[in-house]
């Protein structure tokens, strides 16, 4: 029987093909319709049991959902770009989640692996110096680009599905492969958690590539993700003639501006790093009109859930105070959230032991010091740990052409096979009878 390494290496062309296809047809959060249908078909052909759409995505827990017009427009766009008719109805309306299950029929725990599928709202570089453009797989969808590696993550998930099915006789218990929508903006994981997809999981691993980790290094217990809350603040004032009757107006723009300054003046927390950022401010309707509406798009972050909550609470106070100062109303809407990461030490050690055996891995380390933004797979990790399971977040280093969320982002595709083999070893070599 061919070895695990030989089999994974034989998948390398497919891994590259999948990654480039997903890259070319990039789809951002909650509209990954084409991507989801291709993933579902591949998993179905392998014999996995599938739970799709509303079965694995809680409707009321979705955050940052596009409006109905956008959802329908992107649904039609996906159909025109080759979304598979036999699957697409399951995902209509922004329910683009998939859970594939392989039940071996042999006693053992439930082991889950999570990858994300969404692209960013970003226009890709259109220059021959950019490999995806030069080689013909740059995004064909305006304003949507895989600039964080999720195309690679989806390919890794499919490669892992093929590998575990090939070596199924060496497995025990149940394998769950989770394909998550809308990670960008930390919008999608909570809806899958609230649908119960990880409630039965004993061992959980989430996956990312890059993030500044050098090629050949695998970080097996990334604990540097910050807790975060994303929200919009809508200010509502009263319009008036700016020249004739300015005193009749209540200026929403000034309230939003005052709130912005106050937000960026929130004192840091003594127990760890904190962040606040107003990324967007939109206001007004005309030069000679007292602005009656304004919008702020805001995020808070903290090295711990406690610190993030501190910043968020102060932010709400600042926003309410600014609204009161200018006599306007304000409403905030939650758009995304994630907790800080806290990997399980025993599971991290097991992941390290398996990554160290993979060709192309120079070092398998526990953690890195540099902050890595935020990631909503931490919500899945936390739920698994609440149920006495173990969880971790693994980062596979790779050479990047440009940083994450940059229009020139690209990565060395050799990392795909390294990730597949590492994750497969994690399951295939697991001591099913005694656990860890």
From Swiss-Prot:
Q: What protein is this chain from?
A: p-aminobenzoyl-glutamate hydrolase subunit A
**Record's family?**
Belongs to the peptidase M20 family.
The cofactors required by this protein are: Mn(2+)
Q: Which domain of life is it from?
A: Bacteria
Supply the induction statement: Could be transcriptionally regulated by AbgR.
Per the record, GO CC terms? catalytic complex; cytoplasm
Q: Which Pfam families match?
A: M20_dimer, Peptidase_M20
The UniProt entry's GO biological process terms, in alphabetical order, are:
folic acid catabolic process
Question: Function, please?
Answer: Component of the p-aminobenzoyl-glutamate hydrolase multicomponent enzyme system which catalyzes the cleavage of p-aminobenzoyl-glutamate (PABA-GLU) to form p-aminobenzoate (PABA) and glutamate. AbgAB does not degrade dipeptides and the physiological role of abgABT should be clarified.
Which keywords fit this entry according to its UniProt record? Answer: Hydrolase
Which EC number applies? 3.5.1.-
Cross-referenced SUPFAM superfamilies = Bacterial exopeptidase dimerisation domain (SSF55031), Zn-dependent exopeptidases (SSF53187)
Organism, as annotated:
Escherichia coli (strain K12)
By which gene is this protein encoded? abgA
Q: Which CDD domains match?
A: M20_Acy1_IAAspH
Quaternary structure per UniProt?
Forms a heterodimer with AbgB.
GO molecular function annotation:
dipeptidase activity; para-aminobenzoyl-glutamate hydrolase activity; protein heterodimerization activity
InterPro entries in alphabetical order:
AbgA, Amidohydrolase, Bact_exopeptidase_dim_dom, Peptidase_M20, Peptidase_M20/M20A_hydrolases, Peptidase_M20_dimer
Statement: the UniProt record of this protein carries the keyword Cytoplasm: no
């Amino acid at each position: 029987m061919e070895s695990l390494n030989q089999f994974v290496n034989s998948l390398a062309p497919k891994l590259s093909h999948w990654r480039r296809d997903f890259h070319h047809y990039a789809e951002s959060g909650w509209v990954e319709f084409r991507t989801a249908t291709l993933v579902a078909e591949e998993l179905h052909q392998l014999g996995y049991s599938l739970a799709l759409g509303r079965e694995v995505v809680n409707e009321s827990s979705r955050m940052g959902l596009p409006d109905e017009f956008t959802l329908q427009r992107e649904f039609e766009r996906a159909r025109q770009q080759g979304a598979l008719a036999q699957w697409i109805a399951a995902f209509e309306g922004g329910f683009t989640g998939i859970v594939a299950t392989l039940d071996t029929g042999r006693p053992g725990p439930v082991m889950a692996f999570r990858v994300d599928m969404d692209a960013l709202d970003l226009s890709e570089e259109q220059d021959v110096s950019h490999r995806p453009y030069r080689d013909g797989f740059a995004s064909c969808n305006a304003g949507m680009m895989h600039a964080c590696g999720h195309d690679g993550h989806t390919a890794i998930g499919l490669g892992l599905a093929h590998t575990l099915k090939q070596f199924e006789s060496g497995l025990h218990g149940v394998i769950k492969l989770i394909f998550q929508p809308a990670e960008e903006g930390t919008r999608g994981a909570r809806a899958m958690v609230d649908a119960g997809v990880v409630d039965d999981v004993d061992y959980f691993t989430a996956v990312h590539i890059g993030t500044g980790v050098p090629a050949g290094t695998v970080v097996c217990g990334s604990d540097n993700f910050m807790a975060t809350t994303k929200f919009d603040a809508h200010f509502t004032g009263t319009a008036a003639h700016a020249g004739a009757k300015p005193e009749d107006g209540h200026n929403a723009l000034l309230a939003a501006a005052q709130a912005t300054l106050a937000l960026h003046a929130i004192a840091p927390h003594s127990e760890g790093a904190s962040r606040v950022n107003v990324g967007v401010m939109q206001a007004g309707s005309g030069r000679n009109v007292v602005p009656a509406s304004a919008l702020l798009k805001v995020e808070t972050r903290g090295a711990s859930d406690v610190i993030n909550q501190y910043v968020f609470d102060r932010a709400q106070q600042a926003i309410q105070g600014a609204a009161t100062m200018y006599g306007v109303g304000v409403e905030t809407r939650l758009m995304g959230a994630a907790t800080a990461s806290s990997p399980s030490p025993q599971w991290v050690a097991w992941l390290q032991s398996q990554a160290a055996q993979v060709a192309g891995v120079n070092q398998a380390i526990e953690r890195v010091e540099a902050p890595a933004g935020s990631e909503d797979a931490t919500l899945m990790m936390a739920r698994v740990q609440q149920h006495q399971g173990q969880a971790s977040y693994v980062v596979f280093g790779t050479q990047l052409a440009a940083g994450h969320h940059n229009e020139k982002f690209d990565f060395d595709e050799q990392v795909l096979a390294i990730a597949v083999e590492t994750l497969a070893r994690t399951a295939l070599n697991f001591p099913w009878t005694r656990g860890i």
